[in-house]
Design a protein with these regions (language model features):
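A conserved glycine-rich beta-strand in the N-terminal activation segment of trypsin-fold
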Residues: 131, 135-193
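Short, solvent-exposed coil/turn segments at beta-strand boundaries
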Residues: 92-94, 103, 123, 136-143, ...
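Short, surface-exposed beta-strand/loop micro-motifs that present aromatic residues
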Residues: 31, 85-88, 131-137, 216-220
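Structural boundary/hinge residues at secondary-structure and domain interfaces
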Residues: 17-129, 169-204, 243-271, 275, ...
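N-terminal export leaders
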Residues: 3-7
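Surface-exposed interaction/gating patches
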Residues: 180-239
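Hydrophobic lipid-interacting interfaces of membrane-associated proteins
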Residues: 149, 235-237, 279-281
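Hydrophobic h-region of N-terminal signal peptides that target proteins for export
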Residues: 11-17
């Protein structure tokens, strides 16, 4: 279950928040002002918009991304009930997990202390953790977890005009339609990013191949099955062809290895479209609700199919 849950957000990483205004995904301003200026990757999940969907109930409610795992363990908060929006950021070396919700801060902080986490006062804020990692609350609606030294820098710099999405990353985010409840954007390549993808899966193989991409976006609509769209921009036409052919190769081998008595798997492979347009590779898939389970199993199954 945990591995299946990781698929949807891992796909988003390989390429929040509610689309309330405008045509692109909406990032809650109180979260955006916390994003460091050196951020190269951002991913968002609008939990409120997908809480009642079958995919969330089956998979995303069990998701445990690396930074999210730390946050849940530290605070005891339940993503299924306590969080409304999630944002994950990285500069390629370190990153933050940010969340919006309605928190009983006093009760949570008391629990943190009972769990043995030290209270670290800093510039009017209380950090709970140790000298390596900590979590803090900003008011009763915003929580941030990450490396303790980075949290202190965030506090020092949060009101500076340089904070917020960097221009290149903002431009990428603005291309993601507001009907995508799970989304991500990155600039400057994927090297050094922890994508959280199972290495011994088909998706893990593709993730390894995508290290040469310069920038890209992913958006997933979960309201009626899985509607996935990824736009990947490479450094050269040759890089794009290599990635295009590699993804097509994984799909092709998967089709060839599908038993005759599993026609539903052929349907799944046929939903995946890969197109190269000069330096850009577009990947899309529209999976009907009755095939969601099989789609997740397909891309997380053990063993690597090599093109």
């Amino acid at each position: 279950m945990q591995r299946r849950a990781a698929l949807l957000l891992s796909m988003a990483i390989l390429a929040g928040c509610r689309g309330q205004k405008g045509k692109s995904v909406f990032i809650e301003p109180s979260l955006e002002t916390l994003i460091p200026a050196d951020t190269i990757f951002v991913a968002g999940v609008d939990v409120d918009a997908i809480r009642s969907t079958p995919v969330f109930q089956k998979y995303l409610s069990q998701v445990r991304l690396p930074r999210m795992e730390d946050f849940v363990q530290q605070t005891g908060l339940d993503p299924r009930k306590d969080l409304s929006q999630i944002l994950s950021t990285s500069n390629g070396k370190t990153g933050f997990f940010m969340a919006r919700g309605q928190f009983d801060v006093a009760a949570v902080e008391l629990k943190l202390q009972k769990n043995g986490l030290a209270q670290i006062p800093y510039s009017g804020y209380n950090l709970f953790g140790d000298q390596r990692r900590a979590v803090m609350f900003i008011g009763s609606r915003t929580a941030v977890a990450g490396p303790t030294p980075d949290l202190k820098i965030l506090i020092d710099e949060r009101h500076q005009p340089t904070h917020g999405l960097p221009p290149a990353l903002r431009q990428a985010v603005q291309t993601i339609p507001n009907n995508r409840q799970v989304w991500a954007a990155f600039v400057g390549g994927l090297r050094g990013l922890d994508l959280g993808v199972p290495e011994d899966s088909n998706l893990g193989q593709i993730a390894h191949l995508l290290r040469g991409i310069d920038h890209g976006t992913i958006g997933i609509d979960l309201r009626n099955g899985v509607d996935f769209k990824g736009d990947l921009d490479c450094n050269t036409d040759i890089d794009a062809k290599h990635i295009h052919d590699a993804i097509r190769g994984v799909i092709g081998i998967g089709r060839l290895s599908t038993p005759d008595n599993r026609p539903e798997l052929l349907r799944l492979y046929d939903t995946i479209k890969v197109e190269q347009i000069q330096k850009r590779v577009d990947v899309s898939a529209q999976v009907a609700p009755d095939l969601e389970d099989k789609f997740l199993d397909l891309w997380l199954k053990q063993g690597r199919a090599r093109p």
